[in-house]
C-alpha cells in the first residue's frame, strides 16, 4: 500500500485537474454562448429599432399628408369654392362657346372617373403640359377613390357632376334628384368644391336627370367634338374624331374612367401637341363660358372706342 500511495495521490490530482478543466470548458462555453446570444439580441434589437423608426417616419409622412389635405379641404369648404358659371348659362344646355374664329381656345373634358388605372395617368400628362381641364365625375367613384378626386382639384382642374351611378334608363323625379344631388354632395364633402356643372351619362337628355339639373340651375355641359374613345378605337382614329369637329370655343369629350382607357392615355400627348401646333390654348369649361359671356362686351367696347371722333391734328 505504501508503494501505491504516490500513484493514488497522482491519480487524484489528475482527476481533479480533469474535472477543473471540464468545469472551465463548460464555463467558457456558457460564457461564449451568452455573449453570442447577447450579440444576436443586440443586432436584432438594432434592426427592430431601425424598422420601428422607418415605420414611424412613414406614419408621420402619411399623417402630414392627411393633415394637409384635411386643412385644404376645410379651407375650401369654409371659403365655399365653387365652379360657378355666368348666370345666362345656368339651367341651360351648352355644347360649345360662341367665339370668333380667331379666338382659338378649346376645353378638354374627361368623363366617368375617378378611375384607379387611368385618372392619375391623365392628370400626369396634363400636369406635364401645364393644361387645366374639366372632369365630370361619377359619385360612387368619388366615394371609392377620394384621393383621386382630391388630386383633380389640387392640380387645378375643374370637377363637375356626372350622376351617382351613371345610369341611362329613365328615372322618376326622386331618383333623378338622388343621382344629381348626392353626387354634388360627395364632391363637396371630398374636395370642398361646390359644382354647378352637370353632364348627363351618354348625353341622354330624356331620362329625367337633365330636367332635374336644369330646374336646379346647373349648366348642362354637352360637347362639340366626340373622341368616341369609349369604343377603344385605334389611336389615329380617336385623334381624327376629335379634330374632325374641333373649332374655337369647342368642348372635347374623352374618358378617364369606366373601363380600359389606355388608348386615350396614349393619344392624349399627341392630341395636345396637334392642338398647340394649330395655335390653340386650353381652358376649363367655366373659363370658356366666361369668355363667351365677356366677349360681346369686349367687342362693343372696342367698337365704341374705334367710333370715337378723332381730334384734328394741329397744323
Positions of predicted regions on the chain:
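N-terminal pre-catalytic segment of deacetylase/amide-hydrolase enzymes
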Residues: 2-108, 115-122, 128, 270-271, ...
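Generic detector of intrinsically disordered, low-complexity, polar/charged segments
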Residues: 16-19, 31, 77, 88, ...
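Gly/Ser/Thr-rich helix-start
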Residues: 23, 114, 140, 162, ...
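Active-site beta->alpha N-cap acidic-glycine motif
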Residues: 70-171, 175, 179, 184-186, ...
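Short, structured coil/loop segments at alpha-helix boundaries
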Residues: 116, 142-146, 206, 274, ...
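Catalytic domains of cell-wall/extracellular-matrix polysaccharide-remodeling enzymes
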Residues: 121, 147, 166-281, 285-302
Amino acid at each position: 500500500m505504501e508503494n501505491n500511495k504516490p500513484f493514488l495521490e497522482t491519480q487524484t490530482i489528475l482527476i481533479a485537474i480533469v474535472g477543473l478543466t471540464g468545469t472551465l470548458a463548460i464555463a467558457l462555453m456558457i460564457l461564449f454562448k451568452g455573449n453570442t446570444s447577447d450579440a444576436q439580441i443586440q443586432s436584432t434589437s438594432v434592426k427592430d429599432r431601425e424598422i420601428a423608426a422607418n415605420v414611424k417616419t412613414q406614419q408621420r409622412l402619411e399623417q402630414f399628408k392627411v393633415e394637409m389635405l384635411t386643412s385644404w379641404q376645410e379651407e375650401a369648404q369654409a371659403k365655399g369654392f365653387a365652379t360657378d358659371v355666368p348666370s345666362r348659362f345656368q339651367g341651360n344646355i351648352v355644347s360649345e362657346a360662341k367665339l370668333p374664329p380667331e379666338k382659338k381656345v378649346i376645353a378638354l373634358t374627361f368623363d366617368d372617373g375617378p378611375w384607379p388605372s387611368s385618372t392619375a395617368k391623365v392628370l400626369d400628362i396634363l400636369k406635364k403640359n401645364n393644361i387645366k381641364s374639366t372632369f365630370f365625375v361619377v359619385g360612387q367613384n368619388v366615394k371609392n377613390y377620394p384621393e383621386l378626386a382630391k388630386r383633380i382639384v389640387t392640380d387645378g382642374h375643374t370637377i363637375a357632376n356626372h350622376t351617382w351611378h351613371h345610369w341611362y334608363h329613365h328615372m322618376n323625379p326622386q331618383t333623378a334628384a338622388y343621382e344629381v344631388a348626392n353626387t354634388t354632395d360627395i364632391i363637396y364633402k371630398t374636395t370642398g368644391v361646390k359644382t354647378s356643372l352637370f353632364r348627363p351619362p351618354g348625353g341622354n337628355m330624356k331620362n329625367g336627370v337633365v330636367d332635374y339639373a336644369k330646374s336646379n340651375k346647373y349648366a348642362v355641359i354637352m360637347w362639340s367634338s366626340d373622341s368616341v374613345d369609349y369604343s377603344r378605337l385605334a389611336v389615329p382614329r380617336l385623334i381624327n374624331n376629335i379634330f374632325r369637329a374641333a373649332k374655337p370655343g369647342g368642348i372635347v369629350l374623352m374618358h378617364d374612367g369606366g373601363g380600359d382607357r389606355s388608348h386615350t392615355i396614349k393619344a392624349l400627348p399627341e392630341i395636345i401637341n396637334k392642338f398647340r401646333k394649330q395655335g390653340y390654348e386650353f381652358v376649363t369649361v367655366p373659363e370658356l363660358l366666361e369668355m363667351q359671356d365677356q366677349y360681346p362686351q369686349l367687342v362693343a367696347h372696342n367698337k365704341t372706342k374705334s367710333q370715337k371722333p378723332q381730334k384734328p391734328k394741329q397744323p
